[in-house]
Amino acid sequence: MNYSKAKYIMGAAKVSQLPEDTGVEVAFAGRSNAGKSSALNTLTDQKGLARVSKTPGRTQLINLFDLGNNNRLVDLPGYGYAKVSESIKRQWQSEMENYLTSRKCLNGIVLLVDLRHELKEFDSLMIEMAISFDLNLHILLTKADKLNNKERAQANRMIESFLKTFVSTDKISYQLFSSLTKMGLDKFKEKLDTWYQ
């Protein structure tokens, strides 16, 4: 798959506004400041494709990017400490859950986790939903360039023990990743390629 061909299609506030439910979609999800926009920009080799915001939680729409041949990347709203009301946060979460449960063309979720921090409730929720709906899930442990080898090994052990608390499934995988140094980029592309086949 040539990810550099990605083009922005649209942003939708509701699942009902999304294009026809055909082809293949891979959704990117993550807490605010997990490095989601940076990862999308690195994957597509386009600096400005997904807007990198200095204000966490600015991604409020479901943003779609076309890869050609009815394949799409989907940028889900950043979840976390956005400066919006609780009711709007609940609305975002409701739409995100609606997307994950109802979109038949969704073939996998990329969950971005800043490996400098412990996994949070949102991360657990995403893993549980992926297992419940039998979806592929690939966890990108972002900002790996900010840790030394010993700290990276500790992060790997942390995610391994964390995943052991869930039902065992071969549909969940994880890796270290850095948008800055492109560490893990080739491995990430290989994983996505299998989902778009």
From Swiss-Prot:
Q: Which GO terms describe its cellular component?
A: cytosol
The GO terms this record gives for MF are: GTP binding; metal ion binding
Keywords, A to Z, come to: Cell cycle, Cell division, GTP-binding, Magnesium, Metal-binding, Nucleotide-binding, Septation
Read off the PANTHER family from this record: ENGB-TYPE G DOMAIN-CONTAINING PROTEIN, MSS1/TRME-RELATED GTP-BINDING PROTEIN
Signal recorded as keyword: no
One annotated GO biological process: division septum assembly
Q: Which PROSITE patterns match?
A: G_ENGB
Binding-site residues for GTP, renumbered to this chain: 30-37, 57-61, 75-78, 142-145, 177-179
Q: Which domain of life, per UniProt?
A: Bacteria
Q: Which Pfam families match?
A: MMR_HSR1
Designated name of the protein: Probable GTP-binding protein EngB
Q: Where does Mg(2+) bind?
A: 37, 59
Keyword Metal-binding in the entry? The reply is yes
Entry's InterPro entries? G_ENGB_dom, GTP-bd, GTP-bd_ribosome_bio_YsxC, P-loop_NTPase
In what residue span(s) does the EngB-type G domain sit?
Answer: 22-197
What functional role does this protein have? Necessary for normal cell division and for the maintenance of normal septation.
Necessary cofactors: Mg(2+)
Instruction: Give the family from UniProt.
Output: Belongs to the TRAFAC class TrmE-Era-EngA-EngB-Septin-like GTPase superfamily. EngB GTPase family.
